[in-house]
Amino acid sequence: MAASQQEIIAGLAEIIEEVTGIEPSEVTPEKSFVDDLDIDSLSMVEIAVQTEDKYGVKIPDEDLAGLRTVGDVVAYIQKLEEENPEAAAALREKFAE
């Protein structure tokens, strides 16, 4: 079973807070990383790296450029988890410990 939208948003909110100091309550699906959260490209790369580590996904640079909102990243992670449910389950177990 893939992570729920709320689980992914909560995980992203933690990463975003760690990288930028933005309060997790500000991280909602409709928020744009650049326009609403004022996240620069260097911080976005760090968020992407931590997201890859947390969810065991690979976000190619060309895909990263198209992920403009929190909701875009959530949908992207869910799509990757659906394509490889065994890896998603193993990662959830790893992070539950």
UniProtKB/Swiss-Prot annotation:
It is found in: Cytoplasm. The modification O-(pantetheine 4'-phosphoryl)serine is found at residue 41. It comes from the Bacteria. GO terms for biological process: lipid A biosynthetic process. Its main location: cytoplasm. Keywords: Cytoplasm, Fatty acid biosynthesis, Fatty acid metabolism, Lipid biosynthesis, Lipid metabolism, Phosphopantetheine, Phosphoprotein. This is Meromycolate extension acyl carrier protein.
